[in-house]
Amino acid sequence: MEPGTDVRRVLVIGAGAAGLLIAQVLKKHGVPCTVFEQDTKADARPRDWNYGIYWAQSYLAECLPPELVSQLESAQVDSHTPSGSDILPTFNLATGEPLISVSAPYSYRLQRRKFLNLISTGIDIQYGKRLTMVDSDNKTVTAVFEDSSQATGNLLIGTEGAHSRVREYLLGKERAAVIPSRIVASATVSRLPEREVSALRKLHPRYCIAIHPDGYFNWLGIHDEAAQSKDCTFMIILSWISESDTGLSGTAIAADLKERANTFGEPFRTVLQSIPSETTFWHNRLSSWPTQPWNSHNGTVTLAGDAAHPMTFHRGQGLNNAITDAAYFGRQLAALDTKSTESLSAVVTAFEEELWKRGNEAVTQSDINSLSVHNWEELKSSPLFTSGLKQRSST
Protein backbone atom coordinates (compact mmCIF):
# COMPACT_ATOMS: atom_id res chain seq x y z
CA MET A 1 0.00 0.00 0.00
CA GLU A 2 1.37 3.38 -0.96
CA PRO A 3 2.15 5.98 1.73
CA GLY A 4 -0.82 8.23 2.43
CA THR A 5 -3.40 5.75 1.12
CA ASP A 6 -6.79 6.31 2.74
CA VAL A 7 -7.83 3.90 5.46
CA ARG A 8 -9.99 1.19 3.92
CA ARG A 9 -11.40 -0.58 6.93
CA VAL A 10 -10.96 -1.26 10.64
CA LEU A 11 -11.86 -4.72 11.94
CA VAL A 12 -13.18 -4.91 15.51
CA ILE A 13 -13.33 -8.38 17.07
CA GLY A 14 -16.07 -8.65 19.68
CA ALA A 15 -19.41 -6.84 20.06
CA GLY A 16 -19.17 -6.08 23.76
CA ALA A 17 -19.10 -2.59 25.25
CA ALA A 18 -15.50 -1.81 24.26
CA GLY A 19 -15.91 -3.02 20.68
CA LEU A 20 -19.18 -1.23 20.06
CA LEU A 21 -17.99 2.03 21.60
CA ILE A 22 -14.82 1.99 19.51
CA ALA A 23 -17.00 1.31 16.46
CA GLN A 24 -19.12 4.35 17.38
CA VAL A 25 -15.95 6.45 17.68
CA LEU A 26 -14.69 5.26 14.29
CA LYS A 27 -18.07 6.02 12.72
CA LYS A 28 -18.04 9.49 14.27
CA HIS A 29 -14.70 10.20 12.61
CA GLY A 30 -15.65 8.73 9.24
CA VAL A 31 -13.45 5.63 9.43
CA PRO A 32 -15.07 2.49 7.88
CA CYS A 33 -15.47 -0.26 10.46
CA THR A 34 -17.02 -3.72 10.82
CA VAL A 35 -17.54 -5.52 14.13
CA PHE A 36 -17.23 -9.32 14.12
CA GLU A 37 -18.99 -11.20 16.93
CA GLN A 38 -18.72 -14.92 17.64
CA ASP A 39 -22.29 -15.21 18.98
CA THR A 40 -24.92 -16.00 16.37
CA LYS A 41 -27.12 -13.05 17.41
CA ALA A 42 -27.14 -10.17 19.86
CA ASP A 43 -29.13 -12.01 22.54
CA ALA A 44 -27.67 -15.48 21.99
CA ARG A 45 -26.28 -15.80 25.52
CA PRO A 46 -28.80 -16.94 28.13
CA ARG A 47 -27.01 -15.07 30.89
CA ASP A 48 -27.36 -11.32 31.34
CA TRP A 49 -25.84 -9.13 34.04
CA ASN A 50 -25.46 -5.47 34.91
CA TYR A 51 -22.62 -3.06 35.58
CA GLY A 52 -22.00 0.49 36.70
CA ILE A 53 -20.57 3.66 35.22
CA TYR A 54 -19.05 5.53 38.15
CA TRP A 55 -16.44 7.94 36.73
CA ALA A 56 -16.49 7.50 32.94
CA GLN A 57 -19.72 9.38 32.18
CA SER A 58 -17.99 12.21 30.31
CA TYR A 59 -15.82 9.73 28.39
CA LEU A 60 -18.96 7.88 27.33
CA ALA A 61 -20.47 11.10 26.02
CA GLU A 62 -17.35 11.55 23.84
CA CYS A 63 -17.98 8.18 22.20
CA LEU A 64 -21.67 8.43 21.36
CA PRO A 65 -23.86 10.72 19.27
CA PRO A 66 -26.17 12.95 21.35
CA GLU A 67 -29.28 10.95 20.40
CA LEU A 68 -27.80 7.84 22.05
CA VAL A 69 -26.47 9.69 25.11
CA SER A 70 -30.00 10.95 25.72
CA GLN A 71 -31.26 7.36 25.88
CA LEU A 72 -28.77 6.01 28.44
CA GLU A 73 -31.25 6.07 31.31
CA SER A 74 -33.50 3.71 29.33
CA ALA A 75 -30.75 1.06 29.51
CA GLN A 76 -30.65 1.13 33.30
CA VAL A 77 -31.83 -1.63 35.62
CA ASP A 78 -34.48 0.69 37.06
CA SER A 79 -36.17 4.06 36.63
CA HIS A 80 -33.73 5.98 38.84
CA THR A 81 -32.47 9.32 37.55
CA PRO A 82 -28.75 9.70 38.36
CA SER A 83 -28.06 12.44 40.91
CA GLY A 84 -25.21 13.96 42.87
CA SER A 85 -26.38 12.23 46.06
CA ASP A 86 -26.19 8.68 44.70
CA ILE A 87 -24.46 6.19 47.01
CA LEU A 88 -23.63 2.49 47.21
CA PRO A 89 -24.29 1.34 50.81
CA THR A 90 -22.10 -1.33 52.40
CA PHE A 91 -23.17 -3.54 55.32
CA ASN A 92 -21.72 -6.05 57.75
CA LEU A 93 -22.90 -9.39 56.36
CA ALA A 94 -22.72 -11.02 59.80
CA THR A 95 -24.85 -8.47 61.66
CA GLY A 96 -26.69 -6.45 59.02
CA GLU A 97 -25.25 -3.23 60.44
CA PRO A 98 -24.12 -0.43 58.10
CA LEU A 99 -20.39 -0.13 57.39
CA ILE A 100 -19.97 2.79 54.96
CA SER A 101 -21.86 4.53 52.20
CA VAL A 102 -19.68 4.78 49.11
CA SER A 103 -20.27 7.93 47.07
CA ALA A 104 -21.46 7.22 43.51
CA PRO A 105 -22.59 10.60 42.11
CA TYR A 106 -24.47 10.57 38.81
CA SER A 107 -23.74 6.88 38.35
CA TYR A 108 -25.56 4.64 35.88
CA ARG A 109 -26.44 1.00 36.59
CA LEU A 110 -26.89 -0.55 33.18
CA GLN A 111 -28.35 -3.85 32.04
CA ARG A 112 -25.66 -5.23 29.79
CA ARG A 113 -28.06 -6.46 27.10
CA LYS A 114 -30.00 -3.18 26.96
CA PHE A 115 -26.81 -1.13 26.89
CA LEU A 116 -25.23 -3.15 24.09
CA ASN A 117 -28.43 -2.94 22.08
CA LEU A 118 -28.38 0.84 22.45
CA ILE A 119 -24.74 1.38 21.51
CA SER A 120 -24.96 -1.04 18.57
CA THR A 121 -27.26 1.45 16.81
CA GLY A 122 -25.96 2.18 13.32
CA ILE A 123 -22.98 -0.17 13.60
CA ASP A 124 -22.10 -2.81 10.97
CA ILE A 125 -21.99 -6.09 12.94
CA GLN A 126 -21.45 -9.56 11.52
CA TYR A 127 -22.58 -12.36 13.85
CA GLY A 128 -21.45 -15.97 13.96
CA LYS A 129 -17.83 -14.96 13.36
CA ARG A 130 -15.58 -16.87 15.76
CA LEU A 131 -11.97 -15.80 15.23
CA THR A 132 -9.45 -18.56 14.56
CA MET A 133 -6.42 -16.70 13.21
CA VAL A 134 -4.91 -13.24 12.78
CA ASP A 135 -2.23 -12.45 10.21
CA SER A 136 -0.51 -9.07 9.76
CA ASP A 137 2.16 -8.10 7.24
CA ASN A 138 2.68 -4.79 9.10
CA LYS A 139 0.63 -2.94 6.44
CA THR A 140 -2.66 -4.81 6.38
CA VAL A 141 -4.18 -7.39 8.71
CA THR A 142 -6.44 -10.36 7.98
CA ALA A 143 -8.86 -12.07 10.36
CA VAL A 144 -9.81 -15.68 9.62
CA PHE A 145 -13.00 -17.09 11.12
CA GLU A 146 -14.23 -20.55 12.03
CA ASP A 147 -16.64 -20.57 9.07
CA SER A 148 -13.58 -20.17 6.76
CA SER A 149 -14.49 -16.59 5.86
CA GLN A 150 -11.86 -13.85 6.01
CA ALA A 151 -11.76 -10.08 6.38
CA THR A 152 -8.86 -7.73 5.67
CA GLY A 153 -8.30 -4.19 6.90
CA ASN A 154 -5.63 -1.71 7.91
CA LEU A 155 -6.24 -2.16 11.64
CA LEU A 156 -7.68 -4.96 13.78
CA ILE A 157 -8.75 -4.21 17.36
CA GLY A 158 -9.32 -7.17 19.68
CA THR A 159 -12.14 -6.44 22.12
CA GLU A 160 -13.34 -10.01 22.58
CA GLY A 161 -12.95 -10.32 26.33
CA ALA A 162 -10.62 -11.78 28.93
CA HIS A 163 -9.69 -14.86 26.89
CA SER A 164 -8.78 -12.88 23.78
CA ARG A 165 -7.48 -14.72 20.72
CA VAL A 166 -6.06 -11.43 19.48
CA ARG A 167 -4.05 -11.07 22.69
CA GLU A 168 -2.69 -14.58 22.14
CA TYR A 169 -1.62 -13.57 18.64
CA LEU A 170 0.19 -10.49 19.93
CA LEU A 171 1.90 -12.08 22.94
CA GLY A 172 1.78 -15.84 22.56
CA LYS A 173 -0.41 -18.16 24.66
CA GLU A 174 1.80 -18.21 27.73
CA ARG A 175 2.25 -14.45 28.11
CA ALA A 176 -1.37 -13.76 27.15
CA ALA A 177 -2.88 -16.22 29.63
CA VAL A 178 -5.02 -14.82 32.43
CA ILE A 179 -3.83 -15.37 35.99
CA PRO A 180 -6.29 -17.33 38.17
CA SER A 181 -7.37 -15.48 41.31
CA ARG A 182 -7.61 -17.00 44.77
CA ILE A 183 -11.25 -15.86 44.71
CA VAL A 184 -14.27 -17.82 43.50
CA ALA A 185 -17.81 -16.52 42.98
CA SER A 186 -21.34 -17.88 42.68
CA ALA A 187 -23.86 -15.70 40.85
CA THR A 188 -27.45 -15.64 39.66
CA VAL A 189 -30.21 -13.39 38.38
CA SER A 190 -33.42 -14.32 40.17
CA ARG A 191 -36.82 -13.27 41.38
CA LEU A 192 -37.37 -13.15 45.14
CA PRO A 193 -40.43 -13.40 47.42
CA GLU A 194 -42.14 -10.05 47.97
CA ARG A 195 -41.15 -9.87 51.64
CA GLU A 196 -37.46 -10.31 50.78
CA VAL A 197 -37.71 -7.74 47.98
CA SER A 198 -39.13 -5.26 50.47
CA ALA A 199 -36.42 -6.03 53.03
CA LEU A 200 -33.65 -5.53 50.47
CA ARG A 201 -35.06 -2.32 49.04
CA LYS A 202 -35.39 -0.84 52.52
CA LEU A 203 -31.59 -1.04 52.71
CA HIS A 204 -31.36 0.76 49.36
CA PRO A 205 -33.84 0.95 46.46
CA ARG A 206 -31.24 -0.17 43.94
CA TYR A 207 -28.34 -2.18 45.39
CA CYS A 208 -25.98 -2.85 48.27
CA ILE A 209 -22.80 -4.66 49.23
CA ALA A 210 -22.43 -6.80 52.36
CA ILE A 211 -19.06 -8.01 53.66
CA HIS A 212 -18.56 -10.75 56.27
CA PRO A 213 -15.74 -10.95 58.83
CA ASP A 214 -15.26 -14.58 57.75
CA GLY A 215 -14.27 -13.48 54.25
CA TYR A 216 -17.45 -13.27 52.17
CA PHE A 217 -18.41 -10.49 49.76
CA ASN A 218 -22.07 -10.26 48.77
CA TRP A 219 -23.54 -8.09 46.00
CA LEU A 220 -27.33 -7.73 45.88
CA GLY A 221 -28.98 -5.41 43.40
CA ILE A 222 -31.92 -4.87 41.07
CA HIS A 223 -31.38 -6.31 37.61
CA ASP A 224 -34.79 -5.56 36.13
CA GLU A 225 -37.25 -3.39 38.01
CA ALA A 226 -40.93 -4.21 37.58
CA ALA A 227 -44.15 -2.58 38.72
CA GLN A 228 -44.85 -5.53 41.02
CA SER A 229 -42.22 -6.62 43.56
CA LYS A 230 -42.79 -10.26 42.72
CA ASP A 231 -41.72 -9.59 39.12
CA CYS A 232 -38.46 -7.76 39.93
CA THR A 233 -35.26 -9.67 39.25
CA PHE A 234 -32.05 -9.26 41.23
CA MET A 235 -28.41 -9.95 40.44
CA ILE A 236 -26.86 -11.71 43.42
CA ILE A 237 -23.17 -12.57 43.75
CA LEU A 238 -21.35 -14.23 46.64
CA SER A 239 -17.56 -14.51 46.51
CA TRP A 240 -14.89 -15.88 48.83
CA ILE A 241 -11.29 -17.10 48.84
CA SER A 242 -10.77 -20.76 47.99
CA GLU A 243 -7.26 -22.04 47.38
CA SER A 244 -8.55 -25.34 45.98
CA ASP A 245 -11.08 -26.20 43.29
CA THR A 246 -14.58 -26.01 44.77
CA GLY A 247 -15.97 -28.58 42.34
CA LEU A 248 -19.29 -26.70 42.35
CA SER A 249 -21.62 -27.03 39.38
CA GLY A 250 -25.33 -27.38 38.59
CA THR A 251 -27.73 -27.43 41.54
CA ALA A 252 -24.83 -27.80 43.99
CA ILE A 253 -23.99 -24.10 43.53
CA ALA A 254 -27.28 -22.91 45.02
CA ALA A 255 -27.16 -25.49 47.80
CA ASP A 256 -23.64 -24.39 48.72
CA LEU A 257 -24.61 -20.70 48.74
CA LYS A 258 -27.61 -21.31 50.97
CA GLU A 259 -25.50 -23.36 53.37
CA ARG A 260 -22.91 -20.59 53.61
CA ALA A 261 -25.71 -18.10 54.30
CA ASN A 262 -26.50 -19.83 57.60
CA THR A 263 -23.90 -17.62 59.31
CA PHE A 264 -25.17 -14.39 57.75
CA GLY A 265 -27.20 -11.72 59.48
CA GLU A 266 -30.64 -10.53 58.41
CA PRO A 267 -31.98 -9.70 55.94
CA PHE A 268 -29.16 -11.28 53.96
CA ARG A 269 -29.54 -14.82 55.28
CA THR A 270 -33.24 -15.00 54.49
CA VAL A 271 -32.84 -13.29 51.11
CA LEU A 272 -30.22 -15.79 49.93
CA GLN A 273 -32.06 -18.79 51.31
CA SER A 274 -35.31 -17.68 49.66
CA ILE A 275 -33.92 -17.86 46.12
CA PRO A 276 -36.21 -20.30 44.27
CA SER A 277 -34.80 -23.81 43.95
CA GLU A 278 -35.18 -23.87 40.16
CA THR A 279 -32.97 -20.79 39.70
CA THR A 280 -29.89 -21.18 37.50
CA PHE A 281 -26.56 -20.28 39.12
CA TRP A 282 -23.06 -19.81 37.70
CA HIS A 283 -19.82 -20.47 39.54
CA ASN A 284 -16.29 -19.66 38.49
CA ARG A 285 -12.82 -18.73 39.65
CA LEU A 286 -11.98 -15.10 38.97
CA SER A 287 -8.95 -14.14 36.92
CA SER A 288 -7.06 -11.11 35.70
CA TRP A 289 -4.21 -10.07 33.41
CA PRO A 290 -2.07 -7.06 34.37
CA THR A 291 -1.69 -5.15 31.11
CA GLN A 292 1.74 -5.33 29.50
CA PRO A 293 3.06 -3.87 26.25
CA TRP A 294 2.63 -5.82 23.03
CA ASN A 295 3.99 -5.55 19.50
CA SER A 296 1.20 -3.98 17.45
CA HIS A 297 2.83 -4.94 14.13
CA ASN A 298 3.35 -1.39 12.94
CA GLY A 299 0.02 -0.27 14.35
CA THR A 300 -2.08 -2.89 12.55
CA VAL A 301 -3.24 -4.92 15.59
CA THR A 302 -4.15 -3.73 19.09
CA LEU A 303 -6.42 -4.47 22.06
CA ALA A 304 -9.06 -2.69 24.13
CA GLY A 305 -11.54 -3.45 26.90
CA ASP A 306 -11.33 -6.75 28.75
CA ALA A 307 -8.97 -8.07 26.07
CA ALA A 308 -6.46 -5.42 27.18
CA HIS A 309 -7.11 -5.32 30.92
CA PRO A 310 -9.31 -8.13 32.31
CA MET A 311 -9.84 -7.44 36.01
CA THR A 312 -11.81 -8.59 39.03
CA PHE A 313 -15.18 -6.96 39.65
CA HIS A 314 -15.34 -5.90 43.30
CA ARG A 315 -14.84 -2.16 42.65
CA GLY A 316 -16.63 -1.95 39.31
CA GLN A 317 -13.73 -0.61 37.23
CA GLY A 318 -13.90 -2.81 34.12
CA LEU A 319 -16.61 -1.03 32.14
CA ASN A 320 -15.29 2.40 33.13
CA ASN A 321 -11.87 1.55 31.72
CA ALA A 322 -13.37 0.07 28.54
CA ILE A 323 -15.25 3.33 27.97
CA THR A 324 -12.04 5.27 28.59
CA ASP A 325 -10.24 3.13 26.00
CA ALA A 326 -12.77 4.11 23.35
CA ALA A 327 -12.72 7.79 24.32
CA TYR A 328 -8.92 8.00 24.19
CA PHE A 329 -8.88 6.25 20.83
CA GLY A 330 -11.34 8.87 19.62
CA ARG A 331 -9.19 11.71 20.95
CA GLN A 332 -6.22 10.42 18.99
CA LEU A 333 -8.35 10.14 15.84
CA ALA A 334 -9.66 13.67 16.31
CA ALA A 335 -6.10 15.01 16.34
CA LEU A 336 -5.38 13.67 12.83
CA ASP A 337 -5.19 15.88 9.78
CA THR A 338 -5.78 12.86 7.52
CA LYS A 339 -7.03 9.31 7.92
CA SER A 340 -4.12 7.68 6.09
CA THR A 341 -2.74 4.29 7.08
CA GLU A 342 0.39 5.96 8.43
CA SER A 343 -1.59 8.35 10.63
CA LEU A 344 -3.75 5.49 11.87
CA SER A 345 -0.58 3.70 12.96
CA ALA A 346 0.37 6.82 14.93
CA VAL A 347 -3.07 6.76 16.57
CA VAL A 348 -2.46 3.20 17.74
CA THR A 349 0.98 4.09 19.14
CA ALA A 350 -0.36 7.02 21.16
CA PHE A 351 -3.44 5.05 22.25
CA GLU A 352 -1.37 2.13 23.52
CA GLU A 353 1.06 4.32 25.44
CA GLU A 354 -1.78 5.63 27.61
CA LEU A 355 -3.66 2.32 27.81
CA TRP A 356 -0.72 0.17 28.90
CA LYS A 357 -0.06 2.27 32.01
CA ARG A 358 -3.69 2.88 32.95
CA GLY A 359 -4.69 -0.73 32.27
CA ASN A 360 -1.90 -2.17 34.39
CA GLU A 361 -2.76 0.16 37.27
CA ALA A 362 -6.47 -0.66 37.06
CA VAL A 363 -5.91 -4.42 37.02
CA THR A 364 -3.37 -4.28 39.85
CA GLN A 365 -5.59 -2.11 42.04
CA SER A 366 -8.61 -4.32 41.35
CA ASP A 367 -6.64 -7.40 42.39
CA ILE A 368 -5.51 -5.69 45.59
CA ASN A 369 -9.05 -4.54 46.35
CA SER A 370 -10.61 -7.95 45.70
CA LEU A 371 -8.28 -9.68 48.14
CA SER A 372 -8.70 -6.89 50.70
CA VAL A 373 -12.50 -7.02 50.77
CA HIS A 374 -12.25 -10.73 51.63
CA ASN A 375 -9.94 -10.02 54.58
CA TRP A 376 -11.64 -8.26 57.49
CA GLU A 377 -8.31 -7.00 58.87
CA GLU A 378 -7.48 -5.31 55.55
CA LEU A 379 -10.98 -4.13 54.65
CA LYS A 380 -10.64 -0.55 55.90
CA SER A 381 -7.44 -0.06 53.88
CA SER A 382 -8.95 -1.54 50.70
CA PRO A 383 -9.30 0.70 47.62
CA LEU A 384 -13.10 0.34 47.98
CA PHE A 385 -12.99 1.94 51.44
CA THR A 386 -10.21 4.47 50.77
CA SER A 387 -11.03 5.53 47.19
CA GLY A 388 -14.63 4.41 46.75
CA LEU A 389 -15.64 3.80 43.15
CA LYS A 390 -13.65 6.58 41.53
CA GLN A 391 -10.60 6.02 39.34
CA ARG A 392 -7.48 5.33 41.35
CA SER A 393 -3.80 5.30 40.40
CA SER A 394 -1.36 2.87 42.00
CA THR A 395 1.29 5.60 42.10
From Swiss-Prot:
Q: Protein biosynthesis: present as a keyword of the record?
A: no
**Would you list which residues are glycosylated?**
138, 298
Residue span of the signal peptide, if any? 1-23
Record key words, sorted: FAD, Flavoprotein, Glycoprotein, Monooxygenase, Oxidoreductase, Signal
Binding-site list for FAD: 37, 52, 112, 306
> What pathway or pathways are given for this protein in its record?
Mycotoxin biosynthesis
Q: Name one GO molecular function term.
A: monooxygenase activity
Which SUPFAM superfamilies does this chain map to?
FAD/NAD(P)-binding domain (SSF51905)
User: In the Enzyme Commission scheme, what number(s) does this protein have?
Assistant: 1.-.-.-
Cofactor(s) the protein needs: FAD
Question: According to the lineage, what is the superkingdom?
Answer: Eukaryota
Q: Which residues form a coiled coil?
A: none
UniProt cross-references to InterPro entries, sorted A to Z: FAD-bd, FAD/NAD-bd_sf
Stored Pfam families = FAD_binding_3
For this chain, the family text in UniProt reads: Belongs to the paxM FAD-dependent monooxygenase family.
Name the PANTHER family on file: FAD-BINDING DOMAIN-CONTAINING PROTEIN, MONOOXYGENASE, FAD-BINDING
- Function description: FAD-dependent monooxygenase; part of the gene cluster that mediates the biosynthesis of the mycotoxin cyclochlorotine, a hepatotoxic and carcinogenic cyclic chlorinated pentapeptide. The function of cctM within the pathway, if any, remains undetermined. The NRPS cctN initially catalyzes the condensation of L-serine (Ser), Pro, L-2-aminobutyrate (2Abu), Ser, and beta-Phe in this order to produce isocyclotine. After the dichlorination of Pro2 catalyzed by cctP2 to produce isocyclochlorotine, the cctO-mediated transacylation of isocyclochlorotine can furnish cyclochlorotine.
Protein name per Swiss-Prot or TrEMBL:
FAD-dependent monooxygenase cctM
